[in-house]
Each structure stands twice: as structure tokens, then as C-alpha cells.
Amino acid sequence: MFFLVGILIFGYYTGSFSFSFVNNLQMADGAVPFIAADAAKAVAAGGFILPTALVLMFIGGAGKSAMFPLHIWLPDAMEGPTPVSALIHAATMVVAGVFQIARLFPLWIEYAGGHMSIVVWVGVFTAFYAAAVACAQTDIKRVLAFSTISQIAFMMVALGVCLPGHDGHIIDHHGSLGYMASMFHLFTHAMFKACLFLGAGCIIHAVHSNEMSAMGGLRKYMPITHATFLISCLAIAGIPFFSGFSSKDEIITACFAYSPVVGWIMTGVAAMTAFYMFRLYYGIFWGTENKELHAHHTPHEGPWTMTFPLIFLCLITVGVGIYTTLGGFLNWGGSFGSFVTANGTDYTIHFDLQIALTSTIIAIISICLATYIYKNDEQPIADKLYKTFPRLHRAAYKRFYMDEVYQYVTHKIIFRCISTPIAWFDRHVIDGTFDFIAWGSNEAGESIRPWQSGDVRHYAVWFITGAIALTLVLLAI
């Protein structure tokens, strides 16, 4: 609803629903006016109307991209087949909200720059929340689901921290860092997250369960899936020479340029990402093998139709990672900017060595921590942590009770406090009014029914009486 209202407001005040006029707002120096039709009206209203329309469309995009608190649909949507999740949840459908913000980004910078903080903090909170929930999940699909939410929030934050140009309006080459980082992470995330989802499908196919407790020790049964899953985990953790390294560090660099607070929060979320992904990795491929379950069905590698896509996606992940990592160190530049800007402006990706080293060291520490806790067959440290912080662990496992909050809001507030009075009003007032009209009509009919006796003599008497009465009235007048 918010998205539709935003579109209608946007179209009314701009005179078009097309993106083509947005592209006329060049994301570089010397920008042209963005309105082609009815320019005076739209520009005059731009101080309030256009930012309102953009924020409304952002709310719709936030629901599409599973931003908090509109995220609860995505984990349940993961019940579908993993190839579907790999295609529409990792690469296309769920990132549509981010892409919508990116397509309208010239307008955000020009007319709603003050509202960009909404995008930033919604994304920051969503990224942290989803990463915290992923650390406690035991269902492989749900770990990847909340990982997807967190990574999409990374993209949203990157758009929000994009800095305007020196004139305070149009984005310039320095301010393009967040925009470029967001679109580049959308590109790299599609590869390694699709590989993770397809790998999860191979694992579920092998053990017939989504639960990590049914897994463990699968590396000796599924070597290809093990290798590709490990590479994808390294990519999402942001390790150098894998595709996620450059895009993640670009986002963190843009965050530090916007605010050190945002930068450190997102660095912490990146560390949490490395931790929960390797918690998942060790829980599946290392740890204690479930011999009781495997006695009934020995795990096995999938056919080549299942493993070939994993290998293909991993090759792309590694290839892009090597190219972008070496490009960052050697300052190769590249043409990715012209690929993601509507007018072909070639923005280069900025590489900050200090931030890259810091985030990489933190990611490696997180991986080592996950290795120390979860690699061994026995996991006394993990058990001790669960027993030390049972309420925190349960809250994270229960998604911090967001489902219960929605249940309470819908049943106790919407249904009981809003829907019930409306139903009473409809049943007693609306229906009662029409029932009263029907009852009155029926009573009136019953009262005049004796007049229609079917006796001609009665009709003659009434006719003569009426004629006399009418004559007297006319004579009196």
C-alpha cells in the first residue's frame, strides 16, 4: 500500500512513471534538471512531496527486501526448493527493494538527502538483528535466510551512506563510493549466496533433514559440496581473493566515511557473519557424525546435475575475488561503474588498505573463534555458553520473539480492538438498519393487505369514496 501510494504521488507530481527522466539527472557534475513535463509544479512541490513519495516507496522496498520489521516473511519463504531460493532469494527478487532505491538514487540525493538517515539506520539495525538471529539457528535454511536478510541490509546501508557532491546535491565521484559498493555487493552476493543455497540443497538431499543435528562429518561423504561450501563461506566472510572481500570492504569504507559509529557497527556485523557461517560450516561438515541416522541412509554426493552448478558458481566467485582483490592492491580500476549507472558514468571502486586489513583480521579472528568452539566432535564451550546465557540464546533462536509480537498485534490489537468493534458495528448498525427497513416494509405491507380483498364491491366503495373526497378538496380550493 505504501509503495502504491508513493508511486501515485511520484507520478502525479513528475508527470511520468518512467525511469527515463530520472536518468536525465546525471550522477556527475553539470547535471540537468530532472523534470521534463510540468517542471515548475514538481520542483515547487519537491521540498515536501517528492521526499514523501520516495520514503513511501522505500517502505515498500523495505518490505520487498525484508528489512526490519517487515522481514518475517522471508524465513518462512525458505520452505521452498533450494534452487528457487538460490535464484529469487539470493540473486533477484529479494534485492528488488535495494535495486528500486538505486534506480531512484538521483532523486534521493537531490530531493531527499536529509531522509537518507532513515535508510541507513533501518539497514544497520536489520543487519545486526539478522546476524544475531543467524548465530542461534539450527535449521540450515534459516541460517541462510537470516544471512540473506543481513547481507541485503549491507546493500541498503551502503546506499544510505552515499555522500552528496561538493555542491550538496548531485553525487560526485567521491560520494559514489556507497552507491558503487551497494551495487557491487549485490553482484557478488548473488554468486556466493546462490552457491550456498544450492549446497544446502545437496546436503538436504543427502541427509533428508534441514537440522544441523542430523549432519556432522559430511566432508568425507560429499567432497565437492564441502569444498564449494567452504569457498562460499570464505567469500561471504570477506576473506581476500574471494568475491565478497572487495564489496564488503567497500561498504565498510563508505560507512566509515559517513560515520565512525556506523562503520564500527557494520564491521562488527561482518565479524558476526564470518562467525555464524563457519558455525554452520563446522556443524555440517565436521563435528559429530549422526551414525544412527546414517545407518538408515548413507549420505552421498549428488549427481553432476547438482554439483556442476556449485563448481561453476565457485569458479566465478574465486575469479571475481582474485581480479577485484588484485585490482584493489594494484589500483587497476575497472569499468563496473559504467555497468551500474544509467548514464554510463564510470565510477571506480575505492580501496582503503587500512580498513581492508582491519576487517580481514577481524573476520579471521571470528573464523578462528568459530573453529575453536564448533570444530571438535564435542563442543563443551558451546554447551557452556548456552547454559550461561540461556535466555539470550533462546531469544535469538526465537528471532527475539518477533513472530509472537506480530501474533499479539494481529490477534490482540487488530482483531480484538479494531476488527471486533468494526464487526459489531457492521452487524448491529449497518445490518440492523437494513433489517429495520425490511421489517418496516413488511409491516406496512401487512397493514394494507386487507385493502386488497378481491371483492369488487369493496373496490367500488373505495373508488366512490376517493372520488367524493377528491371533489370536496377541489371545491374547497
Task: State each model region's role.
Residues 335, 374-393:
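C-terminal, low-complexity/hydrophilic appendages and adjacent surface loops
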Residues 1-328, 346-379, 394-400, 404, ...:
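...captures the hydrophobic TM-helix bundle architecture rather than a specific catalytic motif
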Residues 381-386, 407, 433-437:
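A short, ordered amphipathic alpha-helix with a cationic face
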Residues 329-342:
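Membrane-proximal cytoplasmic C-terminal regulatory module of class A 7TM GPCRs
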Residues 388-393, 408-426:
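Short, non-transmembrane cytosolic segments of multipass membrane proteins
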Residues 195-196, 425-438:
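Short, charged cytosolic
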